[in-house]
Amino acid sequence: MKDHTTIIDGKDLEKADKALIMIHGRGGTAADILTLAEALPVEDFALLAPQAAGNSWYPYSFLATPAQNEPWLTASLEQLRQLLARVRAAGITDDNIYFLGFSQGACLALEFVTRNAEKFGGVVAFTGGLIGDRIYPENYKGDFNGTPVFIGTGDPDPHVPVQRVHATTALLQNMHAAVTEKVYPGMGHTISGDEIAQASRLVFRAPVR
């Protein structure tokens, strides 16, 4: 099913007990990011993939000052807020709501959940960090209460400095997220098979085979 801004796939939202919100990267599409679900243990999940206008959630680097990426950043965060409200309205509880993003989508996912920290089902960030020319702790509130988070990144990465990944991990841990950060030397700006395996095991709790 597709509406103006979101593709909905997987189990019917009104019947599912769990939901995964999947956020594409710059230049990507909702349909692209949904294909990742085939590699993850989410067969019983409702899958929701929002589509960014112009295939980008905000125009400049995530390391630009927040003001430079306005009003697009606020609009994108609001799009996620409305999507989360829709999932909650379907009767799915926060501890069964998961977020996943790649690159710009990983940055947006991390920014959104950290501004609205709760005991979510889990968060997967394939190459991303909190948004801004620096980290603004005053923007973040709530308590993750042990939410499992996996952050994977290459080093070096052309878009996401590993130092920002480390700083993001530290802040989320201070907000009581159970963060696993894994740095892959020379991986490039992509998603590796090991990242998929780590996310499956650590966040989606798939049994080890």
Regions found by a protein language model. Name each.
Residues 99-101, 126, 152:
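Short beta-strand immediately N-terminal to the catalytic nucleophile in serine-hydrolase-like folds
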Residues 118-131:
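A conserved short beta-strand
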Residues 1-96:
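Serine-hydrolase catalytic machinery in alpha/beta-hydrolase-like enzymes
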Residues 35, 111-115:
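Active-site signature of alpha/beta-hydrolase-fold catalytic machinery across serine-
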Residues 26, 166-209:
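C-terminal catalytic histidine-bearing segment of alpha/beta-hydrolase fold enzymes
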Residues 33-36, 136-137, 161-171:
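Short alpha-helix in the alpha/beta-hydrolase fold that links the catalytic acid
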Residues 100-105, 109:
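Gly/Ala-rich beta-loop-alpha elbow adjacent to hydrolase catalytic centers
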Residues 150-153, 157:
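Short beta-strand/loop motif that positions the catalytic acidic residue
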